[in-house]
């Protein structure tokens, strides 16, 4: 399953097109993809989760739906605090992206209910021929349960810095920006795993995410 996810992506990480709009789309969509964080339910007692999945643009970009793989791990170190991480790589065409990231999720709420979470996450995108990217994401979410479905709703901001490498393209030497978004996720239990879907919405574009979450212990 994990191999299929890592091999099924169709995103673009090169500047060969040369068009300024295309170059900025590559960088912005990459940063938006990296803003995704694992949906660790603070109301459960499980301490470790593994969450593979994929994210995709909701509209076509240069004739294609750009799709990216995801692989997150989360470890609750206390009742209120979890450490999250991304560490994986894959191959696509002439590129071999490497993703390395870590973050913290803090849970808070009423006396007996931790139904709010806030997170900070830094992720680096390396191993590319045309650029490297660093992103920092901050968000706040509210957990709501309805029957057998758990929802995570909130908003966040992604701050990114990109550095371009020299090559046969006209991309700027560096780019940086901020992407604000509204996020909604939904999880439901199916046998021994949680199945989830979510979306992050920005005025300029929307990205949808599908994932399977395994609670290890």
Show which residues each predicted segment covers:
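Glycine- and aromatic-enriched membrane insertion/assembly motifs of diderm outer-membrane
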Residues: 56-116, 121-122
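Repeat-unit-sized solenoid/scaffold elements
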Residues: 82-92, 116, 182-190, 210-217
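Gram-negative bacterial Sec-dependent N-terminal signal peptides
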Residues: 1-10
